[in-house]
Structures are given as C-alpha cells and as structure tokens.
Regions:
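Glycine-rich flexible loops
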Residues: 1-226
Length: 226
C-alpha cells in the first residue's frame, strides 16, 4: 500500500469512527475527536496522523475534511485547521510507538469521575477484561499545547488501562488501532455509568488482584475469533 493510499484509508476510517462516537452517545456538538496513526512506508516517509478538523459539526464531516498532520502536530494536508487537541495526540504517538489510535471525549459519566478526580475502581468483570484494573486519573492540563498528551503518556505508561480520566476535563483512550481506541472509550463510559449506579446503593468491593489478572489474561488471549 502506498502512503497516499494509506492516508486515504485512514481518512475514511477516522471519519467513520467519529460517526461511531455519535452513535454511542459519547460526544455533544463538536466536542471530542479521533485520530489514527499512518505508518511511514519504509522508504523514508515518516509516520503521519489523521485527525478531526476543529469546530466542524459531526454532520458535516467527510473523509476529505479529515486533516493530515505530522507527528509534531503540523498540518500536512487538509482544508481545515486540525483539532485543538492535535499537539497532545501527536505527543502520544511520538512517545508511545505501539499506539495506532487516540480518542478524546467528554462522555457524561466518565467525565463526572474526572471532575471528582477519582479513579474508577475495578469492581466488575468487564473492567478487569478491558482495562486490567482501575481506570486511572491523570493530571489537570490546559488545552492547546501538548500538556494533556504529556499527562496521558505519564499516566498510561506501564498501566494496563487504555483509558485515562484527565482531571476536570474528560477521557482519553489509546489503542493499537483507532477502532480499538474507540472501543476503549465506549467501554470506559459503560464502566463509569455502571460503577456510579452501583455506588448509589452501597460501596462495591474491588475485585481481588489475582482475579483481575486472570480475567484480563483470558480476555486478551482467548476471547473472540483468533
């Protein structure tokens, strides 16, 4: 696949995944974003990223409107300015080479946990499966530069969770692909809602670490079609 073909495919995929955020109820108005890494072709072309344009309605997004940037956050191709979170996405890609996709949302329940500055405890098996433990809280950081990206990397490095609650802001998720990162965002909101409701009726106990390990191992090595 040529770099040109790979970029076109990434634009189509990133556009489709933004629609998935809307379908899942994770975003409102123009907030939130998905990006995908485009691997260099091995002939000297560096990795690129494709990301949502800033301030454009989800109804108006097309593959052609997705913005191509280098991993310093500079626009390489596209009619529009990229998302205000571009520098942070780029920082994640530079410092976490295993990451192929990044997602940011202000989904309601997960952002409520972020506003409290509280990690979501691992009290249900679905969390052990997907996150391998609690969903951690990252530091407060201002929007616009790469400070959020720095917080994401610092929090998730060495952590099994693909999701982080950035304090008083919202959710960032990572994945081997952009689709994986969107899945993590969907599952993060589902876990945040479930644990919030459980807390309304009492104080659910965390799962024992050995059970979390066993559940996460089974999910990541045996679940699904392989």
């Amino acid at each position: 696949m040529t770099m040109l073909t790979a970029v076109a495919a990434a634009r189509a995929e990133v556009c489709r995944l933004h629609a998935a955020l809307v379908t899942a109820g994770l975003v409102a108005w123009t907030s939130g974003n998905v990006s995908a890494r485009v691997k260099g072709d091995g002939d000297g072309d560096p990795d690129l990223m494709v990301i949502k344009p800033s301030g454009i309605s989800y109804d108006d997004l097309t593959p052609e409107s997705m913005v191509v940037c280098d991993l310093d956050g500079n626009r390489v191709d596209g009619e529009y300015q990229p998302s205000s979170d571009t520098a942070s996405h780029a920082y994640v890609y530079r410092h976490m080479p295993q990451v192929g996709g990044v997602v940011h949302t202000h989904s309601t329940y997960a952002t409520a946990w972020a506003a409290r500055g509280e990690a979501i405890p691992c009290v249900i098996t679905a969390m052990a499966d997907e996150f391998g433990g609690e969903i951690p809280v990252g530091p407060f950081a201002l929007i616009g530069g790469d400070e959020i990206g720095r917080g994401v990397v610092a929090t998730l490095t060495g952590h099994r969770s693909p999701a982080v609650l950035m304090r008083s802001h919202g959710v960032f998720t990572i994945g081997g692909t952009a689709n994986d990162a969107v899945k993590a965002a969907v599952m993060c909101e589902d876990a945040a809602r479930t644990v919030h409701l459980a807390r309304a009726y009492g104080n659910p106990p965390p799962l024992p670490p050995d059970q979390v390990d066993a559940l996460h191992h089974r999910y990541t090595t045996e679940y699904g079609q392989r």
